[in-house]
From Swiss-Prot:
Gene3D superfamilies: HUPs, Tyrosyl-Transfer RNA Synthetase. Its EC number is 6.1.1.1. The keyword Lyase does not apply. Catalyzes the attachment of tyrosine to tRNA(Tyr) in a two-step reaction: tyrosine is first activated by ATP to form Tyr-AMP and then transferred to the acceptor end of tRNA(Tyr). A motif ('KMSKS' region) lies at residues 251-255. GO terms for cellular component: cytoplasm. This is Tyrosine--tRNA ligase. It comes from Thermococcus sibiricus (strain DSM 12597 / MM 739).
């Protein structure tokens, strides 16, 4: 496969940003073996924003000949008070429910889960020289910068936090260098940590990325954060700047079940959630149902997406590009309920293998349910 095709695979939907395409091209031209990683906190049920968005990109990286790795961030989850802050519970869920759920998500998005390396963070964090890398990074970043970076944990700047949470950004940066990762992948909300990694890359003494005797910066690939299905906290949204301000509150959230579809939801749960979704007629800028259609259904174009309607409402209609769908919705030619029903049906079919897996292997999901009940 030529270099341009590899760059196209890395850059396509749901990717929103590559830091930088030129750097990626340089690494490919140098012939440097590429190692990807994406890290996850272990916090609750896997929703589509985690499973399908990450799974789609992992599939793309594999097609581009890049080694892929999922980093199960148990210590990071402990620091960030996930699953009651109980490290043993976090580790059980990580190696049971979460690992299996991600494998199935990768599979339905066209990737090969057997070619993904799964690493539990504590396997490397408990080595002494990992912490030397943390100190090396920390000596090259100001306290103010670390304070601003706590948003990667879903925390607000100025929020009262314990001291352990200040170590978190340096740990996330260290994870990249300590594992020899040259493609750091995450959602857009993790951008600050990756920018720090790129800024300190050429200053590090311990575990820098080196190729042909030269220190190199890791590439950062950030995928789109799916909008939650709920109505935004303010409506209407007046312009792009206001949207940026409230975007964090609009993303899918495990703590708001009706904002998210989980990978093992039943067909009826999926349909019910989509029926209740915020989807104003004619609104194409801040519309979660259209957002899901764009980044899940129309990830690859052309495709065929058929919306079934009674003849009196125009009959069935098939779209091959997102722009066609968006135009008809904007012009009122497509009713919100028809769009919701069609997206729901698509997801029901897409997620069928995941549901079937958990029906045949119920133990991981039962463990997760028991943890949720006792939290």
């Amino acid at each position: 496969m030529d270099i341009e095709k590899k760059i196209e695979l890395v850059s396509r939907k749901p990717t929103e940003e590559v830091l930088t395409v030129d750097n990626l091209k340089d690494l490919l031209e140098m012939g440097m073996p590429l190692q990807h990683y994406i890290g996850f906190e272990i916090s609750g049920y896997i929703h589509l924003g985690t499973g399908l968005m990450a799974g789609a990109k992992i599939a793309d990286f594999q097609k581009a000949g890049i080694k892929t790795r999922v980093f199960l961030a148990d210590w990071h989850s402990w620091i960030n008070d996930k699953l009651g802050g109980d490290l043993e519970v976090i580790q059980k869920v990580a190696l049971g429910y979460f690992k299996e759920g991600m494998k199935q998500s990768i599979k339905v998005m066209g990737g090969d889960p057997e070619k993904v390396e799964f690493v539990l963070a504590s396997e490397i964090l408990e080595r002494g020289d990992y912490w030397r890398t943390i100190i090396d990074i920390s000596k090259n970043v100001t306290l103010a910068r670390m304070m601003r970076s706590i948003t990667i944990m879903g925390r607000q700047m100025g929020e009262a936090i314990d001291f352990a949470k200040l170590i978190y950004p340096a740990m996330q940066v260290a994870d990249i260098f300590y594992q020899g990762v040259n493609i750091a992948h995450a959602g857009m909300d993790q951008r600050k940590a990756h920018v720090i990694a790129r800024e300190v890359a050429e200053k590090l003494k311990y575990h820098p990325l080196v190729w042909d005797g030269k220190k190199v910066k890791p590439i950062a690939v950030h995928h789109h954060l799916l909008l939650g299905l709920q109505e935004p906290p303010k409506w209407p949204i007046e312009g792009e700047e206001e949207f940026k301000e409230i975007k964090a509150q609009m993303k899918m959230s495990k703590s708001k079940p009706y904002s998210a579809v989980f990978i093992h939801d039943t067909p009826e749960e999926i349909k019910q959630k989509l029926r209740k979704a915020f989807c104003p007629a004619g609104e194409v800028n801040y519309n979660p149902v259209l957002d899901w259609a764009e980044h899940i259904i129309f990830r690859e174009e052309p495709t065929e997406f058929t919306i079934h309607r009674p003849a009196k409402f125009g009959g069935d209609v098939t779209y091959t590009t997102f722009e066609e769908l968006k135009r008809d919705f904007a012009e009122g030619k497509l009713h919100p309920l028809d769009l919701k029903n069609a997206v729901a049906e698509y997801l029901v079919e897409l997620l069928k293998p995941v549901r079937e897996y958990f029906e045949k292997h119920p133990e991981p999901l039962e463990l997760m349910k028991s943890v949720q009940i006792t939290r």
